[in-house]
């Protein structure tokens, strides 16, 4: 059975969670198809998510379709929670990019696309809400072309599809047709981004998308040596620390030791429910308990640390209430700082400083501190997070002394410095 990890990514209100719900319902994984506006979807079970109608935290679910086991990570679509989305990208085999057919490509869509390029994630595209849009498929495809010229409506002719990849061109010229494996290879190499249209709410186009995921995806070669990537730290309802990983090679077992810490449990999550398993093998997405040292972006065995490319633009000072215990205030923030590393938490004598993306994230931070730790906090108006760097090329001379001889090294640092161009009467 082919086993893959797929990520649901989109700008806010594109219908990403609705598509996740439709995929689970269509395959018989869930019996009731919830709706975001009814506040009863399978994956948005957090109270704040249901009240706001947006995804705040990434969720894991899985389904079986034909000879495939697909694990889906439903990620936040709101720009304020882009860090949570980016961390999931490091463990994806493929992304499903959902576009709102009413809007086309949005600014955050471009951010997502750039991140997919950074992490080398191949993608399928699903244009949603086609039952409501006044745009034609051709107009929407024209909008999508600003992301890549390799996006192709899969209802096009095989000749048009083949034109996007040299190997497919050769095959088509020789045989007059294309094999599914050839199309799958082009997608995996990011020479082709298949495009589908439909309505997730009405389950239109969902069967076609599932069929494409079956026919046009490839599984990575088996790896025997242990390797795993950490992409999420969170806590369960009892406060148990959960380390979400994707096993990319070998096997992990309960009671195995990682950095002198023993794995207590291996949990296989389906929404907010989980099953305890004794081991996890390649391509499994699981949560570990008993592990305190690993952080988001870390790895187990073979691999490398993943660093976020995103940087929040604002710094905020956070004050506890007058009645608060300062140590409890700090320890509570440390928990949230583990779960969202982009907070870049700094602690001072009587307050803390965090980096945040926007107003919605501020509101959620306040609510999390109240709901989870019974802490009332005050957040100031914030200031721009400036980054300091050199303006001009400089030459530095450094010396190092190997065992047998004296050496001198000249280092030349060069940074292109530019100032903003005048715009709307402003001066740089």
Which positions does each model-derived feature cover?
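P-loop NTPase catalytic nucleotide-binding module
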Residues: 1-14, 32-33, 101-237, 257-258, ...
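P-loop NTPase switch module centered on the Walker A-proximal segment
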Residues: 1-91, 95-99, 105, 139, ...
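Active-site phosphate-binding and catalytic loops of NTP-dependent enzymes
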Residues: 30-36, 43-57, 150-154, 216-225, ...
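C-terminal polymerase-core module
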Residues: 383-419
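Single conserved hydrophobic/aromatic residue that forms the stacking wall/gate
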Residues: 417-428
